[in-house]
A protein has these predicted regions:
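Conserved ABC transporter NBD signature motif
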Residues: 16-32
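Conserved ABC ATPase signature
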Residues: 91-95, 99
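Catalytic Walker B motif of ABC-type/P-loop ATPase nucleotide-binding domains
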Residues: 116-120
């Protein structure tokens, strides 16, 4: 979470710098969507699903101006992608945890970010919705890069393209694999990977100072 806040500019780094690159060239910033770990929305606040998703475009709207037709259309497209069309006019206080998660994800992608940052996105989503949630992320990943923080390694293992381990120091493993032994070290207990079909097998280089 701290690393994500540094990337987002919410916290200054103690040392080092954050650089953004686009097509191999350093750029001053990128369009970033963010889904925080904890849901800070007051569910008693009288706001609808559509209004929450629309709020993700607030930075694009000039002060005292209405949203354009194209922006409103974009909101409707996101509602469709999230499967929220039938809930668009419903107050957020009436939603389940999985439904609210989809609303917040919709808000984070409606601005069409170049990078989507998710902090423990399945922390308050029930298991029945989790599979569908990751299918949504796979679809979003076709248009946006995704940085996902999760302690649930088993869930994301088959989906991620690169792994970064953070324990005081950041260890980055591009295109790497994870072994059962590595998982066992991180969970402090023996781990056995079980799955149907092609099982992802990943082996990471040993971290220094471990």
């Amino acid at each position: 979470t701290t690393l994500l806040k540094v990337i987002l500019g919410l916290l200054p780094p103690v040392s080092g710098t954050i650089r953004f690159y686009e097509d191999g060239q350093m750029v001053p910033s990128l369009r970033i969507g963010y889904l925080p770990q904890l849901n800070n929305i007051d569910k008693k606040f009288p706001i609808s699903v559509r209004e929450v998703v629309t709020s993700g475009l607030a930075s694009e709207k000039p002060l005292f101006r209405s949203y354009s037709a194209s922006q409103k259309q974009r909101v409707e497209e996101v509602l469709g992608k999230m499967g929220l069309e039938d809930l668009a006019g419903r107050a957020i206080g009436e939603l389940s945890g999985g439904q609210l998660q989809r609303v917040l994800l919709g808000r984070s992608i409606v601005s069409r970010p170049q990078v989507l940052i998710l902090d423990e996105p399945n922390s308050y989503v029930d298991k029945r919705f989790e599979s569908h949630f990751y299918k949504l992320l796979d679809e979003i990943n076709k248009e946006s890069a995704i940085i996902l923080v999760s302690h649930d390694i088993g869930t994301v293992l088959a989906m991620v393209k690169n792994i970064a381990c953070v324990n005081e120091t950041l260890h980055y493993h591009p295109g790497a694999d994870v072994s059962e032994e590595w998982l066992g070290e991180k969970y402090a207990c023996p781990i056995e990977l079980i799955g149907h079909g092609d099982l992802p097998h990943r082996v990471l280089k040993k971290h220094e100072h471990e």
